[in-house]
From Swiss-Prot:
Cellular-component GO terms for this entry: cytosol
Binding site for substrate: 63, 150, 162
Organism lineage: Bacteria, Bacillati, Actinomycetota, Actinomycetes, Mycobacteriales
Protein name: Glutamate 5-kinase
Biological processes annotated in GO: L-proline biosynthetic process
Catalyzed chemical reaction(s): L-glutamate + ATP = L-glutamyl 5-phosphate + ADP
Pathway: Amino-acid biosynthesis; L-proline biosynthesis; L-glutamate 5-semialdehyde from L-glutamate: step 1/2
Record-listed E.C. numbers: 2.7.2.11
């Protein structure tokens, strides 16, 4: 949506979105003593059911597995070590799924649990399988309940938070909108305790986030709000409009969408492949390129040729996704490389005409190259 569109226009888009992803944070699903709260879940499901009754497809991204497993295991504080977190998640996931299932059963609806890891999203074939599973659940009139598979995810290979997972899922399923629900009502331009604090109702680009802090007084650069803003920007950069608000306003968020902060999407929605390559794919290595090549692949939208590559980093094979770095090591984007790293080393800095006939294809074709600058 461009500058001519108002916040009311964007809220109307979210209000009428046919396919919507709704992410709910742990604190909105659990009560005191870290137990799953059926009452809180029932209230959320009531709003979800009302939205589905209006004709929308709803995909739920649910946090809360680790928190829900703490009380049954006798844990009084959130575990810090990976093994205990995974044990809590394995117990909590059962309680959480039962709570969702029982609540939706009041409306004669079935749920389907989908547990994902970062490696699932990072491998293209596994990402497609996840997409097909979610699509089939919807066709069979089951509500997909998605969560990170904390039981098997490692500290090195995980989404980090379900906000990012929700952003990735929203693009994976071609959602028309993403709603992020937590325990904060939106963004402010200064501490809300300050009488002059202004509620930030819309974010069009990064400039609108300067000095912004969370509705609960926490800085955007710290804690949970940082991940929510990051996820909202991730989804909006890919072309998905986002509404960020408190779970206390779930009925309003899924009703008239007149609450919270909205994030404007880019007009040009990224293709599924480019989004996956840029934000989800595993990378096999990196290519450092010169300033001329940076301009060619960003402003020019051209393919990356061997002449502009100054360094090959890591060992990789043709067809893998690699990071593309600028002269100072800054990340420019990602792309699917056409040659093995061992072959590329022999091609560095050479004009296409200087290369053997079998090596004259672009190193990264423009169709398989995503740059971050175009999504700012």
């Amino acid at each position: 949506m461009n500058a001519q569109h108002s916040s009311a226009d964007l809220r109307d888009v979210i209000r009428n979105a046919k396919r919507i992803v709704v992410k709910i944070g742990s604190s909105s699903l659990t009560g005191e003593n870290f137990e799953v709260s059926p009452g809180r879940i029932d209230r959320i499901v009531e709003a979800l059911e009302d939205r589905m009754h209006r004709g929308s497809d709803v995909i739920v991204v649910s946090s809360g597995a680790v928190a829900a497993g703490m009380a049954p295991l006798g844990l009084t504080s959130r575990p810090k070590d990976l093994a205990t977190k995974q044990a809590a998640a394995s117990v909590g996931q059962v309680h959480l799924a039962n709570a969702w299932g029982n609540s939706f059963a009041r409306y004669n609806r079935t749920i389907g649990q989908v547990l994902l890891t970062a490696s699932d999203a990072g491998q293209r074939d596994r990402a497609r399988n996840a997409q097909r599973t979610i699509d089939r659940l919807r066709l069979l009139h089951a509500v997909p309940i998605i969560n990170e598979n904390d039981t098997v995810a490692t500290s090195e290979m995980h989404f980090g938070d379900n906000d990012r997972l929700a952003a990735i899922v929203s693009h994976l399923v071609s959602a028309d909108a993403l709603v992020l629900l937590s325990d904060v009502d939106g963004l402010y331009d200064k501490n809300p305790a300050d009488p002059s604090a202004r509620f930030v109702s819309e974010v069009r680009d990064g400039n609108d986030l300067k000095g912004v802090i969370a509705g609960d007084g926490g800085a955007v650069g710290t804690g949970g709000m940082a991940s929510k803003v990051s996820a909202a920007r991730l989804a909006s950069r890919s072309g998905v409009p986002v509404l960020l608000t408190s779970a206390d306003y779930v009925a309003e968020a899924l009703g008239d969408a007149e609450v919270g902060t909205v994030f404007y999407p880019k007009d040009d929605r990224l293709s599924a492949w480019k989004f996956w390559a840029l934000y989800a794919a595993d990378t096999g290595g990196a290519l450092r390129i010169d300033a001329g090549a940076v301009a060619a692949v960003t402003a020019g939208g051209n393919s990356l040729l061997a002449v502009g590559i100054t360094e090959v980093i890591g060992d990789f094979h043709a067809g893998e996704i690699v990071e593309i770095l600028g002269p100072e090591g800054e990340i420019i984007g990602r792309g699917e490389v056409a040659y093995d790293s061992a072959v590329l080393i022999t091609m560095l800095g050479k004009q296409t005409a200087q290369l053997p006939e079998g090596l004259q294809r672009p190193v990264v074709h423009a169709d398989y190259l995503s740059d971050y600058a175009s999504r700012a």
